[in-house]
């Protein structure tokens, strides 16, 4: 825990993105003790997403610098210490294709590269997450069968998606600002 905390304090990344289990491991390793083990409770998926989101914010509040956490899964979660957003875009097929997590991280990095302040970085993370999910939805429409054709369609969708498509398809769940 102390080594992880020290490394993060030294590097001060703008964001960390991972799937639910990777973010859960980060939180569990941090010893936040916020009950995020509910994440693995398949019987209560909504509770699990909420528990992970709460755990993410609790963890971020322990840091001495601003950072964003993005967790991808059934419903993507974007969290900062004082804001939380659930992104509902995406396709279940994304989890069955190797490399989509890496693609999502690259999209996030590109969006964050143009964000100049903490609030803008949070919005950039939300839109990057939605953008990747929308590309996954478009790919599913383009390649209704097979993971190989889906992977190619996803790359095609990422390179041809328009601002109008994003605006017409974006699906955000509850977005809230939390006072410290």
Q: What do the predicted segments below correspond to?
A:
Residues 3-84:
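Conserved phosphate/ATP/ADP-binding segment of small-molecule kinases
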Residues 20, 50, 102, 118-122, ...:
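Electropositive phosphate-/nucleotide-binding environments in soluble metabolic enzymes
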Residues 25, 98-131:
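Short, small-residue alpha-helix embedded
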Residues 53-60, 119-136, 154-155:
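Short, well-structured alpha-helical segments that form the helix of a local strand-helix-strand
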Residues 77, 103-105, 137:
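Short, electropositive, low-hydrophobicity segments enriched in small/polar residues
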Residues 79-89, 128-145:
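Glycine-rich phosphate/pyrophosphate-binding loop at beta-loop-alpha junctions
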Residues 87-99:
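Short pre-catalytic strand/loop immediately N-terminal to key active-site residues, enriched for Gly-Thr
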Residues 134-180:
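Charged C-terminal helix
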